Amino acid sequence: MTLQEEIIKELGVKPIIDPKEEIRVSVDFLKDYLKKYPFIKSFVLGISGGQDSSLAGRLAQIAIEEMRQETADASYKFVAVRLPFGVQADEEDAQRALAFIKPDVSLAVNIKAAVEGQVAALNEAGVEVSDFNKGNIKARQRMITQYAVAGQYQGAVLGTDHAAENITGFFTKFGDGGADLLPLFRLNKRQGKALLAELGADPAIYEKVPTADLEEGKPGLADEIALGVTYNDIDDYTEGKVISEDAKAKIEAWWNKTQHKRHLPISIFDDFWK
């Protein structure tokens, strides 16, 4: 088995999907979790305005609405959380996403004071915080906030990790990589777009240039520039297609470099890293 085949098997990506069928798979997955753990009464998700959170958010809202209808339990809620750092340049995109998702509850928590306070405390202790490191602090603060909200709403936190992101490790460890459920796992970027189109999303949501937007020195830096490879190549790779040797080498280098992000903390019984 080639490395490409091993990766595809681990990520569970299908070369061809039926968007309507995959929507039902994700919705049922979320509902099954609620049925298994009846003390969980909500799903919580941070909404950035990009493709991934828009899709995960809409799927979660559908699942919650179906649970309310099937159980007659009005306490089930989907909570969407805006998590800007100061004034968010793409706030209009976030509002467009919220209009599409139609969440039961919409909150906004500005993380700037918390992040700046953490950086100041580190500086006071003699620790210099690089722009890159501060970006990771932002991602982790956003998850701290979502788990606090989940505590209020008896909720589980959703993540937006998908195959095209997972393969490159393009997420912050214990930041946006930390969640309870991943309804998009198994889908690559273009498949996520197909689901959004099937759900009737404004094309502006899934045509937006993907960016983590964590570094202040590189505002709006496109994911593809940061990775050095296009999502089209990543998607082709995860679908088992032949791509250029250069793109293939970059993707596989990211996979190998970020293995630690796809595992729980390493114990003496783990050997994937050796």
Curated annotation (Swiss-Prot):
ATP binds at residues 46-53, 160, 189, 211. Its EC number is 6.3.1.5. SUPFAM superfamilies: Adenine nucleotide alpha hydrolases-like. InterPro entries: NAD/GMP_synthase, NAD_synthase, NH(3)-dep_NAD(+)_synth, Rossmann-like_a/b/a_fold. Pfam families: NAD_synthase. Mg(2+) binds at residues 52, 165. The keyword Metal-binding applies. It comes from the Bacteria. Keywords: ATP-binding, Ligase, Magnesium, Metal-binding, NAD, Nucleotide-binding. It catalyses: deamido-NAD(+) + NH4(+) + ATP = AMP + diphosphate + NAD(+) + H(+). One of its GO terms (cellular component) is cytoplasm. It is an enzyme of class 6 (ligase). Pathway: Cofactor biosynthesis; NAD(+) biosynthesis; NAD(+) from deamido-NAD(+) (ammonia route): step 1/1. One of its GO terms (biological process) is NAD biosynthetic process. GO terms for molecular function: ATP binding; glutaminase activity; metal ion binding; NAD+ synthase (glutamine-hydrolyzing) activity; NAD+ synthase activity. Deamido-NAD(+) binds at residues 140, 173, 180, 260-261. Catalyzes the ATP-dependent amidation of deamido-NAD to form NAD. Uses ammonia as a nitrogen source. NCBIfam families: nadE, PRK00768.1. Homodimer. Belongs to the NAD synthetase family. HAMAP family: NadE_ammonia_dep (MF_00193). This is NH(3)-dependent NAD(+) synthetase. The lineage of its organism: Bacteria, Bacillati, Bacillota, Bacilli, Lactobacillales.
